[in-house]
């Protein structure tokens, strides 16, 4: 139970309000039932169930997903990176990854750094392969690998509209319906990778546990072959629109910064909040 990691006073408050989640799927399923036709019609009761569901999401699903991602792909550490549309390269094959499932983006990142594929990119006139992220996947790639962040969710169409993106690769959630139409106005290939989230008019290459790396290589090759199709007259990459950032301050990193390898602790921070030197 991840909720038991919260401070005791907070847990007591949750129990008093009766909003401690009983299980992740139970709260979601019950919310769906309550909001069905002619069921729960008391707004106060619905709000309390919404609180339980949000707790199940945050202290259940999100924390489990975070732990599993750190186990599979490594815990992030402070890393320098860059952000904004200026990270898109005018003279390289540009691939944008966008979504929420780390499996796809991690494999595309590995494939994009393959010397064999970089040579293929150079053979079509590019200086290399540039990978950038949009939305939540972008944050994961930035934290773990320093791969640039092209923008947040509302900037996905703008990234395509630079005219310099050979492929935008997506999986689930936050993918705007207009992306495919914008991509058609340029040379950009839009590629979906999840069987749960296909988009009409796009190319679909399913990525799963067995074929992830091989399919990622196929995707990178599609982007490389698309590089000569770029219309230079349509290319507009905002100059100077790029910021340097330092990211990756995880729970483990902060404890280490406060106490070193052998005395990692939040005590210095807690003490200074209590004595008033730090407002928290």
Tell where the protein language model's regions lie, with residue ranges.
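Metallocofactor- and cofactor-centric catalytic cores in central/energy metabolism, strongly enriched
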Residues: 1-280
